[in-house]
């Protein structure tokens, strides 16, 4: 099986090998495309560039980039069918007598391609018809080498295990428990607070990192493309990907939940001294997240503390030592397109590349900004050029961004999970937005006329009071 790909493996456009010598209609695939790096080409040429021969194997950079971006133009199952058809046609695998020496050289490269494809994009092989294409072409070369059958069996076994693991999506991690929303403050006798479950900021930062990496593990690279897919003007129908970005959506929901959990924990206590204590606790948790490299939890905590129901608690904030909070806010300041955060992210990425331990390898980006960057890359450049060619240069940049993310999400979490803490993070009830405002007004009375009118409205709608 292939080793795990790294960002440097995936994207080294200047080192792409020349494509195979077979020609495709209207173009010579044997001609290097921009010194080996295909800036643009027809879809047929790019597919041909993916197909191995006895003497040619595409670079890892090309394989990842094309498999990632091709789904904008062709369904993965159709792409595999075309690759298999080209293999059969070019290697004459439909003939009764095969050139065994040549087929053995080709077969090893074909199995390598299939191994890389199933390892990096396992969800492309969820349909039985896709597996059928794979087993058909391998079945044709198996008589030339008795090891091919066992190697394919192992490949499929690994694939099925990976699909089964991915099928246990993030939602299953919390079992049957579903978070509920508070509308009003519950009696203190029945409410559990986070500080009662975990009072050490570093421990909570570790457990948040555990949750983040577990959720990231389920996001496939293809979801970044499928989230923004538009109908290809040269394709007959739009690929149906609406059900294939669930993990991205679930991860964004987790970020929002953490924001609301932070705000809920702050607004819940009746006394401002306790509220100030909770704020200072979360500031310390956020600082530990920053030190670990967990920027997503860091941003969620800061966002939760900046929600209006929390930020308006002036008497509470007056009791808080805010110096550390302002430093963290500065790091995540959106000014200059988050330039401070991007500098910190580059520092964490460099630390990860030179790491001597799993602890130093952790890089969890602010996910919503990553999605935004990919969205603007997609919107800012056309998928096809005016001549109909695929804009492969755009997809090299896309692969660079996604490939880096894939490297980060594959890091093993070095922190031991504490089920009681992660269970609380997933299932603790949180206030709705209106509930947060009502709790905030009950903690510190409304000051402006607008706040007084809103408080009156919330008391009427939620509590049934006037």
Swiss-Prot record:
InterPro entries assigned: Ras-like_GEF (IPR008937), Ras-like_Gua-exchang_fac_N (IPR000651), Ras_G-nucl-exch_fac_CS (IPR019804), Ras_GEF_dom_sf (IPR023578), RASGEF_cat_dom (IPR001895), RASGEF_cat_dom_sf (IPR036964)
Protein function: Guanine nucleotide exchange factor (GEF).
Region (Disordered), start-end ranges: 1-35, 443-466
Pfam family, one: RasGEF_N
Gene, per the UniProt record: Rasgef1c
Positions of the Ras-GEF domain: 200-446
Gene3D superfamilies, per the entry: Ras guanine-nucleotide exchange factors catalytic domain (1.10.840.10), Son of sevenless (SoS) protein Chain: S domain 1 (1.20.870.10)
N-terminal Ras-GEF domain sequence ranges: 34-164
GO molecular function: guanyl-nucleotide exchange factor activity
One GO biological process term: small GTPase-mediated signal transduction
Protein name as catalogued: Ras-GEF domain-containing family member 1C
């Amino acid at each position: 099986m292939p080793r795990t790909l790294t960002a440097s493996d995936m994207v080294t456009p200047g080192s792409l090998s020349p494509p195979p010598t077979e020609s495709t209609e209207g173009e010579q695939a044997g001609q290097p495309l921009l010194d080996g790096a295909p800036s643009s080409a027809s879809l047929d040429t790019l597919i041909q560039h993916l197909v191995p021969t006895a003497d040619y194997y595409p670079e890892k950079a090309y394989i990842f980039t094309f498999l990632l971006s091709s789904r904008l133009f062709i369904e993965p199952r159709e792409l595999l069918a075309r690759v298999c058809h080209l293999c059969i046609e070019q290697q004459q695998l439909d003939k009764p007598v095969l050139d065994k020496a040549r087929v053995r050289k080709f077969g090893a490269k074909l199995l390598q391609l299939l191994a890389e494809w199933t390892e990096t994009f396992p969800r492309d092989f969820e349909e039985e018809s896709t597996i059928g294409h794979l087993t058909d072409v391998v079945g044709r070369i198996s008589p030339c080498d008795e090891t091919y059958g066992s190697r394919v069996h192992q490949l499929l076994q690994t694939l099925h295990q990976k699909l089964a693991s991915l099928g246990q999506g993030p939602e299953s991690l919390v079992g049957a428990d579903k978070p509920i929303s508070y509308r009003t403050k519950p009696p203190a006798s029945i409410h559990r607070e986070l500080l009662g479950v975990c009072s050490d900021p570093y421990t909570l930062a570790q457990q948040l990192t555990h949750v983040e990496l577990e959720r990231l593990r389920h996001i496939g690279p293809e979801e970044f493309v499928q989230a923004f897919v538009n109908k290809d003007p040269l394709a007959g129908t739009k690929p149906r990907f609406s059900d294939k970005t669930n993990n991205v959506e679930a991860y964004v929901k987790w970020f929002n939940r953490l924001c609301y959990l932070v705000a809920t924990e702050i607004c819940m206590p009746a006394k401002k001294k306790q509220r100030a204590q909770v704020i200072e606790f979360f500031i310390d948790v956020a600082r530990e997240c920053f030190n670990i490299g967990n920027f997503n939890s860091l941003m969620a905590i800061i966002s939760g503390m900046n929600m209006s129901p929390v930020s308006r608690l002036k008497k509470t904030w007056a009791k808080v030592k805010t110096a550390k909070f302002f430093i963290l806010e500065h790091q995540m300041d959106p000014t200059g397109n988050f330039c401070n955060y991007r500098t910190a992210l580059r520092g964490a990425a460099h630390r990860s590349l030179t790491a001597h331990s799993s602890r130093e390898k952790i890089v969890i980006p602010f996910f919503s900004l990553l999605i935004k960057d990919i969205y603007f890359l997609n919107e800012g450049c056309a998928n096809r050029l005016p001549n109909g060619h695929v804009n492969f240069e755009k997809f090299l940049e896309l692969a660079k961004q996604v490939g880096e993310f894939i490297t980060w999400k594959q890091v093993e979490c070095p922190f031991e999970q504490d089920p009681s803490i992660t269970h609380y993070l997933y299932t603790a009830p949180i206030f709705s937005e209106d509930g947060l405002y009502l709790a905030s007004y009950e903690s510190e009375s409304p000051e402006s006329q607008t706040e007084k009118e809103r408080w009156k409205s919330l008391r009427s709608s939620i509590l049934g009071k006037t």
